[in-house]
């Protein structure tokens, strides 16, 4: 598709789609809890639909009336062996978290996905689940999809130190621990997003969290709840950056989730001198209205324990850095290589083709800022990565003339089906 270029500014209010991480987990907890779970403002993107279809295949009744989703949970022990292999689409979250649930169920399930998901390593989740007693077989020593899980009704609790900072692996172990005999201990090296722990408590479960250590007793019973999903800060990130770098822009984003394990991008914007206001903060819902204006920005360093708090936002942060004066260094982010694409290489290639000056490194990027972007000579392919597609669409707004062709733009449906509609709306408000 041809992208809109040469924006004269973006103006207006926007409510971004529901948080993808919370949407996945609300379906999962609703499916393993007993009783009715009602979910408001869920993200209806392709990844979350993969989770919904997987639990329907496991025997859970899930209704969608277009307004709310209702999950009729009967408890985890009532999940049934699916009649065929489960299609995870492009969703790493669906695959890894569901693996933790399947690990404790006494039947065999095969999971498969698209080409991108089939390249992603699942050994990181298979290893602790095998230690607990599940049998898991996948492709190559990295346990890639298709992967078959033979669960055990007698999982054993473990003490496990996560080798990588991964909320998905942590969550898989927590889901398995709910079904295990004994007390499971999970230790993180870097703190990652905490939605699983918080939602477990919301559904009546027990977990003790102290800094980077979580203790989960086994044999827990959960009860259905009512959940309202806040806006996704990872989706809001594209508009935050657009509002900062496109001249004559001023944007207000309503009801954005600001869980402290996800707000790294807000700290980066402030460190770079961006005009950002946090308004109407709801401490209970962990949501706020965010306002940004076009700003003069300066380079910064992004590393260490900040990385897990903005890992999904790093592609659009790279674009932000191209428009800041001076150098921005991103390090400790090797995890980017095993996302939907190798995001270090793909981000650098895409933005460099538009005139940016980005040097990819083993664990991040060195970005020389203050560069003027131009139309690339060739089309840019998302390679099936939704965040690459949206990053390029925002970058295109900075290009004064020429044409930018985005191939496989449909990947954006994964997390933000209304992205181009929202872009049009904000462009028309001038």
Swiss-Prot record:
Entry EC number(s): 2.5.1.19
Domain of life, per lineage: Bacteria
Positions annotated to bind 3-phosphoshikimate: 20-21, 25, 166, 168, 312, 339
One cellular component (GO) term of this entry: cytoplasm
Enzyme class: transferase
Primary subcellular site in the record, as a coarse category: cytoplasm
Annotated binding of phosphoenolpyruvate, by residue: 20, 92, 120, 168, 343, 387
Alphabetical GO biological process terms: amino acid biosynthetic process; aromatic amino acid family biosynthetic process; chorismate biosynthetic process
Catalytic residue positions: 312 (proton acceptor)
Compartments, record wording: Cytoplasm
Keywords: Amino-acid biosynthesis, Aromatic amino acid biosynthesis, Cytoplasm, Transferase
Pathway terms, separated by semicolons: Metabolic intermediate biosynthesis; chorismate biosynthesis; chorismate from D-erythrose 4-phosphate and phosphoenolpyruvate: step 6/7
One function term, GO molecular function aspect: 3-phosphoshikimate 1-carboxyvinyltransferase activity
Coiled coil: none
Reactions accelerated catalytically: 3-phosphoshikimate + phosphoenolpyruvate = 5-O-(1-carboxyvinyl)-3-phosphoshikimate + phosphate
Quaternary state and interactors: Monomer.
Similarity comment: Belongs to the EPSP synthase family.
Role of this protein: Catalyzes the transfer of the enolpyruvyl moiety of phosphoenolpyruvate (PEP) to the 5-hydroxyl of shikimate-3-phosphate (S3P) to produce enolpyruvyl shikimate-3-phosphate and inorganic phosphate.
HAMAP family the record matches: EPSP_synth (MF_00210)
Protein name, as recorded: 3-phosphoshikimate 1-carboxyvinyltransferase
Species annotation: Lactococcus lactis subsp. cremoris (strain SK11)
């Amino acid at each position: 598709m041809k992208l809109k270029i040469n924006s004269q500014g973006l103006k207006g209010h926007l409510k971004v789609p529901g948080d993808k991480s919370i949407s996945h987990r609300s379906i999962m907890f609703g499916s393993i809890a007993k009783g009715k779970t009602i979910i408001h403002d869920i993200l209806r993107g392709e990844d979350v639909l993969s989770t919904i279809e997987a639990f329907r295949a496991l025997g859970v009744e899930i209704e969608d009336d277009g307004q709310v989703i209702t999950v009729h949970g009967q408890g985890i022990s009532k999940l049934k062996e699916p009649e065929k292999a489960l299609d995870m689409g492009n969703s790493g979250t669906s695959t890894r978290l569901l693996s933790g649930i399947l690990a404790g169920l006494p039947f065999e399930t095969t999971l498969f996905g698209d080409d991108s998901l089939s390249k992603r390593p699942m050994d990181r989740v298979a290893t602790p689940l095998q230690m607990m007693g599940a049998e898991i077989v996948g492709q190559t020593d990295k346990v890639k999809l298709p992967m078959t899980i033979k669960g055990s009704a007698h999982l054993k609790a473990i003490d496990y130190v996560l080798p990588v900072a991964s909320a998905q692996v942590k969550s898989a172990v927590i889901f398995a621990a709910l079904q295990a005999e004994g007390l499971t201990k999970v230790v993180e090296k870097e703190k990652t997003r905490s939605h699983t722990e918080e939602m477990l408590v919301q559904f009546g479960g027990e977990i003790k969290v102290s800094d980077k250590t979580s203790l989960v007793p086994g044999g827990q019973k959960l009860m259905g709840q009512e959940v309202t999903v806040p806006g996704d800060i990872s989706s809001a990130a594209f508009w935050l950056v657009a509002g900062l770098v496109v001249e004559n822009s001023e944007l207000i984003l309503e009801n954005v989730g600001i869980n402290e394990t996800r707000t790294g991008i807000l700290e980066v914007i402030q460190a770079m001198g961006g005009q950002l206001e946090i308004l109407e903060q709801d401490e209970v819902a962990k949501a706020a209205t965010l306002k940004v204006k076009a700003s003069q920005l300066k380079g910064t360093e992004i590393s260490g324990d900040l990385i897990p708090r903005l890992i999904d936002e790093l592609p659009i942060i790279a674009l932000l850095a191209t428009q800041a004066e001076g150098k921005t260094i991103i390090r400790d982010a090797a995890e980017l290589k095993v996302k939907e694409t190798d995001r270090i290489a793909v981000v650098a290639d895409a933005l460099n083709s538009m005139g940016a000056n980005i040097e990819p490194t083993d664990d991040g990027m060195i970005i020389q800022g203050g560069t003027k972007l131009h139309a690339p000579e060739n089309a840019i392919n998302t390679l099936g990565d939704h965040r690459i597609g949206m990053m390029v669409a925002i970058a295109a707004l900075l290009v004064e003339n020429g044409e930018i062709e985005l191939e496989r733009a449909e990947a954006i449906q994964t997390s933000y089906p209304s992205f181009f509609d929202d872009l049009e709306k904000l462009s028309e408000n001038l």
